[in-house]
Amino acid sequence: INEDINEEWISDKTRYSCDGLKNQRIDSPYLKIENKFLKTSWEEAYKKITDKIKNTSSDKIAGLTGDLTNMETAFIVKEFFNKIIKSNYLDSRTENIYVNINDRKNYIFNASINGIEDTDLLILVGANPRYEATILNARIRKAYLKNKTKIFSFGDLGDLTYPYEVLSNSTSEINKFFQDKIDLSEKLKKSKKPIIIIGQSALKL
């Protein structure tokens, strides 16, 4: 239980995720031998990986974590590459979306999770919190119930469990917003505790 994050609640996606597991999912390591994947033990797999790393220059080794990788595993992979392999060739953007990681503000969520409840204006750009971050969506709903927070979205997201105003999701409309050329730009200036949530899909525009 973490009162600052989920307040002991879990989403339906979390509760029933076990029903979505496929019986043909990967449950053990496989080695590719003569163009065929053969089941093997973890010990044998680790031995093969170790041998490959020992006999390969660090500038020839790269790592890629997928969208379903949990934070702990991703961090361990990063530490392994930075401290053991001595390589920075590591990425997690499976869709090749550019994010400058040299500046922290490009990838951190500046507001705290529970701090969302205090916002008076929330803007969604390329983000659907109900399906992408259910805990976040629950906090946004609390913000609306608690403060009647004004919520805007570039694009219709369907039922988010709270009312919001839909704006055009065209790149020109989003560009006008950031150039202070639409009404929402003025609302942002007058807001005391605004939050803008930019989702990954916005980077594909």
What are these regions (language model features)?
Residues I1-L205:
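Catalytic alpha/large subunits of respiratory electron-transfer oxidoreductases
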